[in-house]
Design a protein with these regions (language model features):
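Hydrophobic alpha-helical transmembrane segments
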Residues: 27-32, 57, 65, 86-90, ...
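Transmembrane helix-bundle core of multi-pass membrane transporters
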Residues: 130, 134-197, 223-226, 245-254, ...
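Transmembrane alpha-helical segments in multi-pass inner-membrane proteins
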Residues: 235, 245-311
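Membrane-interfacial amphipathic/re-entrant helices at transmembrane-helix boundaries
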Residues: 2-66, 102-107, 218, 226
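Single transmembrane alpha-helix segments in multi-pass membrane proteins
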Residues: 35-101, 126-131, 269-279, 312
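Short loop segments and helix-boundary regions at transmembrane helix junctions
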Residues: 17-23, 80, 115-158, 196-198, ...
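Helix-loop-helix "hairpin" substructures at the membrane interface of multi-pass membrane proteins
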Residues: 104-110, 118-123, 127, 173-249
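Hydrophobic core segments of alpha-helical transmembrane domains in multi-pass membrane transport
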Residues: 30-42, 71, 146, 182-192, ...
């Protein structure tokens, strides 16, 4: 009777090892950078690496991250949406006005989402059907949406007194702020959509090669409209959370949030040329920006210098995006 010996599997043959390598290859750079920043700011200021401050960082980036989830969809198609900041302001003021008219919060949520869908349909229709470049369309609607927010409010903030509405941005569940729960839930939902559904695969295929997508039977026009609608809905959710946190709908809120959303997505590995990126990378990018902002605030760095740093971060992220594109091609 002979004895059979089983060969030990190589590390590359172990699923867990493969998954770890894949995750590290995809997110290792940005995660390493974030860890270095956390260590640096922790040495500079003792109050940085505390439970309260870490929670505060996540809470502060939640609105940008949720908006950036939507931006990821658009960038994956090779388009862009510069109207998300104005969408946040308009939906926030819309919801605040509804609350001031006595509309129950349980009705305000679907009404605000429907309003956001309409804004997304405008952007998507002008881009996909009229054939106007998304950059031009969303620059125009950025001004239009913001202008409407000023018109309906007479340029004044609309105070929110509805307790349920205020709980959206300021309440807690199991000692964790509600915006963080929303951030996590939307991360899981959008990650599932992009990685496990036919709709998500169509987005990657279209962003990677539009001609091939058309030849394979994908209705690119319909897909693009849906993507812009999703982006608007996520911006609308951010708008309701921001209005709640500010205790008012403000037409001048969310200024330059579109740049923060783009920075988070690109820093997290989403390509500006389409076809490559994930919402997991996007949330890591948003958290990295949050760490930078929080660290500089604790160091009392003036806001104008923070703008310079944020601009440099975007430039570096775009540089690596271009370099990675050359490698992939």
């Amino acid at each position: 009777m002979t004895e059979k010996t089983l060969a030990s599997p190589k590390p590359s043959e172990i699923p867990i090892a493969n998954n770890f390598k894949k995750v590290f290859r995809q997110y290792g750079g940005i995660l390493s950078g974030m860890v270095v920043l956390i260590i640096l700011f922790s040495f500079i200021n003792d109050s940085f690496f505390t439970a309260n401050n870490i929670t505060n960082i996540i809470l502060q980036v939640s609105i940008i991250a949720i908006t950036a989830y939507g931006m990821t969809y658009v960038l994956l198609l090779g388009d862009i949406n510069l109207s998300v900041g104005s969408t946040i302001a308009l939906i926030g003021t819309f919801a605040a006005l509804g609350a001031s008219w006595g509309i129950p919060f349980i009705l305000l949520v679907p009404l605000s989402i429907i309003a956001a869908l309409a804004l997304g349909m405008i952007n998507g229709g002008l881009t996909a059907i009229a054939g106007i470049p998304s950059f031009i369309v969303t620059v125009a609607t950025m001004g239009i949406f913001r202008g409407i927010a000023y018109i309906v409010t007479d340029g004044m903030p609309i105070m929110i007194k509805d307790d349920a509405f205020l709980a959206l941005g300021n309440g807690e569940f199991l000692y964790i702020p509600i915006p963080i729960w929303i951030l996590i839930i939307l991360l899981l939902i959008n990650h599932f959509i992009l990685t496990k559904t036919t709709f998500g695969r169509k987005i990657y295929i279209t962003g990677g090669n539009k001609e091939a997508a058309i030849y394979s039977g994908i209705n690119v026009t319909r897909l693009k409209i849906k993507v812009f609608m999703i982006t608007a809905v996520l911006a609308g959710i951010s708008g309701m959370i921001l209005a709640s946190r500010l205790y008012s709908g403000q037409p001048n809120s969310a200024l330059s949030y579109e740049l923060d959303a783009i920075a988070a997505a690109v820093l997290g590995g989403t390509s500006l040329n389409g076809g490559y990126g994930t919402v997991v990378g996007t949330v890591i990018g948003a958290l990295t920006i949050g760490v930078i902002n929080n660290g500089m605030n604790l160091m009392n760095v003036p806001y104008f210098y923070q703008m310079v740093v944020k601009g440099l971060v975007i430039l570096v992220a775009v540089y690596f995006d271009v370099r990675n594109k050359r490698k992939r091609s």
